[in-house]
């Protein structure tokens, strides 16, 4: 059944493109400094997400972040097609997707990419990420203590086998840029040493409680645009990624106080901070008022330098998306995934 994309959007809610900050990639291409994520965490229907994508495009979003692992690319493809019928050009959009861990074998990469393109009803992607730097997978509903018998530590040679297929995809015109994701500096330095086509983006967890300042500055020094997932601290993340020591980002006193001062939600403070810092955040929401206020926030009432400094103090190096389900037998801690032990 076709998805009903009927919605009433006041013209005053539409945000002009020239008001939205842009990021210039090393290729010279421009990418919006703010986008919409599409990971539903099994809490919303694929149709709800597709309607949010269509609504977001109608009000001014142009960066849409997808992934095959989210299992909703066919529905999102319908939303993108509808937006084009509405008069929003493909060239104005920046659509990204990601290659899942079980498709890293060289013979699987291009066919998987072509399936994503078919599902999204596109001829090319603006960027294609390697979702995780491992071929490790997990069973549906896996818990913290579960270990897949085939999981292994990072292997650079295997990663580069996959990466070289993305380089071929650039040559074929199927993708415009290569993205890395869930990486560390140690791993990325090896990729930069061996890559024929440099990655243009790196997607990573970033929010005020986990700002990753050293890695962030390293990426910028290498001409790689940091893209922030979970920019609000992922309050709806899976239980397997929760620990008692986790810090709820939106409840941080400094964030709450700044939000009160500006008359906005703490989530909007996080979005403003991310964009003003130089990131490209991709918060997810199916709720119109939320994704509208997020985009509108980056066009007005910026945080002061003093407020940005206050938010810097919130950083507790608290990683929330730990990836425990990708650990291998014998691994002592999720930190092994991040080269921290």
What is the predicted function of each stretch?
Residues 34-47, 98-107, 150-157:
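Active-site mouth loops of central-metabolism enzymes
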Residues 101, 132-341:
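Beta/alpha (TIM)-barrel catalytic core signal, keyed to glycine-rich beta->alpha loops juxtaposed to Asp/Glu
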Residues 24-26, 77-90, 117-122, 192-195, ...:
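Acidic (Asp/Glu)-rich catalytic clusters
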Residues 62, 123-126, 176, 200:
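Short acidic/polar active-site loop segments enriched in Thr and Asp
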Residues 94-107, 129-135:
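Structural motif corresponding to the early beta-alpha repeats
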Residues 109-130, 168-172:
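CE4/NodB-like, metal-dependent polysaccharide N-deacetylase domain
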Residues 43-57, 105-120, 161, 186-189:
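Short, acidic/polar
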Residues 2-93, 110, 232-235, 336-341:
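N-terminal binding-site loop/beta-alpha segment at the start of enzyme catalytic domains
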């Amino acid at each position: 059944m076709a998805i009903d994309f009927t919605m009433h959007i006041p013209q005053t809610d539409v945000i002009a493109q020239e008001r939205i900050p842009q990021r210039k990639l090393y290729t010279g291409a421009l990418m919006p400094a703010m986008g919409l994520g599409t990971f539903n965490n099994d809490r919303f229907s694929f149709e709800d997400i597709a309607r949010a994508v269509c609504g977001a495009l109608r009000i001014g979003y142009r960066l849409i972040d997808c992934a095959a692992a989210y299992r909703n690319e066919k529905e999102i493809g319908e939303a993108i097609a509808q937006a084009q019928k509405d008069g929003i050009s493909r060239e104005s959009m920046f659509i990204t997707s990601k290659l899942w861990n079980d498709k890293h074998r060289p013979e699987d990469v291009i066919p998987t990419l072509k399936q994503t393109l078919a599902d999204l009803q596109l001829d090319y992607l603006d960027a294609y990420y390697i979702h995780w730097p491992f071929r490790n997978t997990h069973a549906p509903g896996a818990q913290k203590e579960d270990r897949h018998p085939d999981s292994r530590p990072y292997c650079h040679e295997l990663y580069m086998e996959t990466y070289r297929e993305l380089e071929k995809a650039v040559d074929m015109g199927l993708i415009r840029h290569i993205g890395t994701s869930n990486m560390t500096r140690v791993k990325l330095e090896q990729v930069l040493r061996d890559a024929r086509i440099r990655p243009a983006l790196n997607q990573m967890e970033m929010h005020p409680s986990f700002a990753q300042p050293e890695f962030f500055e390293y990426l910028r020094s290498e001409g790689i645009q940091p893209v922030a997932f979970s920019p609000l601290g992922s309050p709806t993340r899976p239980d397997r990624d929760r620990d008692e020591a986790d810090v709820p980002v939106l409840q941080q006193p400094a964030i709450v106080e700044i939000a009160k001062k500006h008359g906005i939600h703490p989530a909007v403070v996080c979005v403003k901070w991310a964009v003003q810092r130089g990131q490209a955040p991709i918060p997810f929401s199916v709720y119109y008022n939320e994704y509208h206020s997020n985009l509108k926030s980056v066009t007005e009432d910026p945080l002061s330098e003093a407020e940005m400094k206050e938010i810097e103090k919130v950083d507790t190096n608290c990683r929330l998306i730990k990836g425990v389900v990708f650990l291998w037998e014998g691994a002592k801690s999720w930190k092994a995934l991040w080269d921290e032990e």
